[in-house]
Amino acid sequence: MSTLACKNVAYAYEKGKGILTNISFSFESGKMYAILGPSGSGKTTLLSLLGGLDTPAKGNILFDDTDITQTGLEEHRRNHISLIFQNYNLIDYMTPIENTKLVSKVDAVPILQRLGLTEDELRRTVLKLSGGQQQRVAIARSLASDAPVIL
């Protein structure tokens, strides 16, 4: 079972204005967690750090007891983490199936259908789907990657 942990992580966009200060916790794969807080409290920033998109100002992010802040965030992101972004990051001229196959060679149709997309919707470009349908495509893409951690 994989673990993703923060140890005394801090981050600030401007010097002296810390968004995250001394954050420590541990997540185990196979479990679901929620990060809650008001707007501007650092939830998205924390997910960016966990996903290897940014580096903490201090502290460590560990994946299976390996300090990924020292060993390579890009490798960690590519091999162990799947991110579902707020803006979905879909290729709008591609279909849901094509978008899902960008991360995996698995048969995307059952995953997309399990998330409620119809045969007709699978043939449309994602630009022609509703926001909720696009979100389901982004979720399907993360599930298809089979990463131990989805953020």
Residue ranges and their predicted role:
Residues 36-38:
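The feature captures the beta-strand-to-loop junction immediately N-terminal to the Walker
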Residues 51:
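Helix-to-loop junction immediately C-terminal to a conserved catalytic motif
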Residues 59-67:
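Conserved ABC transporter NBD signature motif
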Residues 67-82:
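ABC ATPase NBD coupling module
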Residues 111-127:
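Conserved ABC nucleotide-binding domain
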Residues 125-129, 133-135:
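Conserved ABC ATPase signature
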Residues 139:
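Hydrophobic anchor residue at the start of the ABC signature
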